[in-house]
Amino acid sequence: KSQHQYGQYLNLCHFGSLANDRSLSIVMRAANTLFEKFPEARNHLRIHAYGAPLDSLSQEAIHRYGFSDILLAHGRLERDPVTGISGREKVAQKMQEADVLILLHGNDEWCAEYIPSKFYDYLWSGRPIWGITHRNPQLDQMLLDRKSYLSADGDDAGIAMALEKIWLDWRQNQLLSPIWQPIGVDQAVSSILSHITQ
């Protein structure tokens, strides 16, 4: 993997669908708190949304905080007819260019039961992940095992603290380096066996 390029902006990127129960509004609320404490962060933090349209809570937060220059909605990445690069290849490229990837788990009760497929896409990118999860100790452990930033959905203070840590790490050019552990068959089998033998 080539060395990550730190630039003028701290680019937090979310890929995939958004909804009122899986919204970037919670990240914008944390950004507002960050800017109160570190006003200069306002000139550097950018939140990018790729994929689906913004949910209504995210749109409201943009207006409430005046964040039209902070949250940038790019929509779906489509195939480039000139270069022939597919939308999927563009997504992979944008993931690898991100400073931090935002994994929004949602806050439905069924979130406690599943691991989002986006998590695996993010792992392959090799970029730091900021997981905002909902009552899912297994997902939390998978994130922590791979050196990720972690917050609990609904914990505004904790989310703000995580964003502050990301900001301070970025300023030092020392964002967490994820441990490269894509999940393969071997790991799945050993994990299943460890649960059976307990």
Predicted regions located by residue number:
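Conserved donor-binding/catalytic core segment of Leloir-type glycosyltransferases
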Residues: 4-22, 28-31
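Nucleotide-sugar-dependent
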Residues: 22, 78-94, 101-120, 130-141
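Short hydrophobic signal-anchor/transmembrane segments that target glycosyltransferases
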Residues: 25-41
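Nucleotide-activated donor-binding/catalytic signature segment of Leloir-type glycosyltransferases, i.e.
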Residues: 38, 42-44, 48-52, 56-92
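Flexible glycine/serine/alanine-rich "lid" or loop that lines and gates the nucleotide-sugar donor pocket
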Residues: 96-97, 124
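A charged, aromatic-enriched C-terminal amphipathic alpha-helix characteristic of glycosyltransferases
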Residues: 153-161, 168-198
